[in-house]
């Protein structure tokens, strides 16, 4: 029987085969006509790739059927080298959680009155405390500095 093989260039080859012929035999006949080695050939019929050991009748290939020839692509992407670091990774700073830290800002006296231990920023308002640097007070929010009088 006669089958057609359509190549990548759009050229159609006619082959004389039997339904009992294997895909290997068909590929060797294509090699004789086109010079493409069988290990680089992929034959497609009805959207399926044809395996080498099977016969034409296994795929229900009848007379005047058209097979599509595509070339096999070898390999994949180039392997990338793993980065080697010369210095060890910097250890991330871990926040130390202090339980009941708010007790450091206020003091309760014997009479039950609450007194602030730190000064509040006059620019930022209540709740923003100034850092005490001995000779001066500093606001971390608005970056104001207040000098203490001696």
UniProtKB/Swiss-Prot annotation:
GO term, biological process aspect, one: translation
MF annotations from Gene Ontology: structural constituent of ribosome; zinc ion binding
CDD domains from the UniProt entry: Ubl_ubiquitin
Ranges for domain Ubiquitin-like: 1-76
Record Gene3D superfamilies: 6.20.50.150, Phosphatidylinositol 3-kinase Catalytic Subunit, Chain A, domain 1
GO cellular component: cytoplasm; nucleus; ribonucleoprotein complex; ribosome
Site of covalent link Glycyl lysine isopeptide (Gly-Lys) (interchain with K-? in acceptor proteins): 76
InterPro entries linked to this entry: Ribosomal_eS31 (IPR002906), Ribosomal_eS31_euk-type_sf (IPR038582), Ribosomal_zn-bd (IPR011332), Ubiquitin-like_dom (IPR000626), Ubiquitin-like_domsf (IPR029071), Ubiquitin_CS (IPR019954), Ubiquitin_dom (IPR019956), Ubiquitin_ubiquitin-like (IPR050158)
Other observations noted: Ubiquitin is encoded by several different genes. Ubi3 genes code for a single copy of ubiquitin fused to the ribosomal protein eS31. Ubi4 is synthesized as a polyubiquitin precursor with 5 exact head to tail repeats.
Family of the protein in this entry: In the N-terminal section; belongs to the ubiquitin family.
UniProt name for this protein: Ubiquitin-ribosomal protein eS31 fusion protein
Organism field: Kluyveromyces lactis (strain ATCC 8585 / CBS 2359 / DSM 70799 / NBRC 1267 / NRRL Y-1140 / WM37) (Yeast)
């Amino acid at each position: 029987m006669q089958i057609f093989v359509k190549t990548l260039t759009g050229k159609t080859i006619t082959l004389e085969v039997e339904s009992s012929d294997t895909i290997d035999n068909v590929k060797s006949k294509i090699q004789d006509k086109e010079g493409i080695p069988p290990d680089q050939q992929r034959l497609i019929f009805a959207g399926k790739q044809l395996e080498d050991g099977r016969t034409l009748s296994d795929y229900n290939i009848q007379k005047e059927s058209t097979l599509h020839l595509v070339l096999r692509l070898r390999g994949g992407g180039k392997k990338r080298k793993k980065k080697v670091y010369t210095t060890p990774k910097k250890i991330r700073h871990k926040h130390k959680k202090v339980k009941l830290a708010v007790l450091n800002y206020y003091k309760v006296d014997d009479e039950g009155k609450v007194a602030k231990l730190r000064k509040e920023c006059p620019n930022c308002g209540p709740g923003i405390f100034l850092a005490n640097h001995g000779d001066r007070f500093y606001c971390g929010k608005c970056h104001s500095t207040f000098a203490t009088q001696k």
